[in-house]
Amino acid sequence: RIPYDRENTSMVDFPMCGYCEDQYTDLHNRRHHAQTISCHGCGPQLLWKTRDAACDMTEVPEGMTDDEHRTRDAAILDSAADILKSGGVIAFKSVGGYNLVADPLCDEAVHRLRIIKKRESKPFAVMFRNLDEIRSFSYISDTEAKLISSSARPILLLEHRESDSSEINRSRFIGSFLPSFAAQYMLLDRISPLIFTSANLSDMPMIKDESDMFDMFEKDPLIDGVLYNTRRILLRADDSVARVIDDQPQMIRRSKGYA
């Protein structure tokens, strides 16, 4: 809805604490009327569900300090990265829905992901930490670099360089993209690159709700964990896909960032 006010977004579930409200109402503060303003104390919380209930972090203790929140979040991301480094597959809650995440350089992980998705041969999109990492796998022009770095963060089809990875060499092009929000950046700081593909069965809608994701997690033992948060997803939005032809961007799938 318009205007883009907090009460019309999923942030309505997170009342501002006094510290955030002071900044929100201060005409001279850079966060004045920033509708998504929040902190560790009053904003969405990172949560983690695994096959081992003893390792779950599905609740946030009350009264935690900012440093304690940061330590807890780091522990969650470390645990998720450890699973990915060992060839596992996790579900990850992104802005517009859940993704399934795996290491594209690990044949076992890719094989497991194909079984989960019932997707025998179609290549997966790969998220890279930064442009330098993309350049180590693909050829990328200035126009392509500008598009892939834009705020819309589309998946961009790039011609790949030769690589030892069968997954990245599966097609002439790699569907490449960059992280678009903090949790993705922090996960890729721990392991990169990573396959990010929609959490669904082929030809089914992308999962956006915890109930559906947990149901899939319980039914499919090949998914090792669910990394999620307490912010509701109101509108499902998959990543947009584009390609640059004759130095002109061409949309293949118009969705997040463009729709």
Features from the language model and the residues they span:
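Active-site-adjacent structural elements in enzyme catalytic cores
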Residues: 1-259
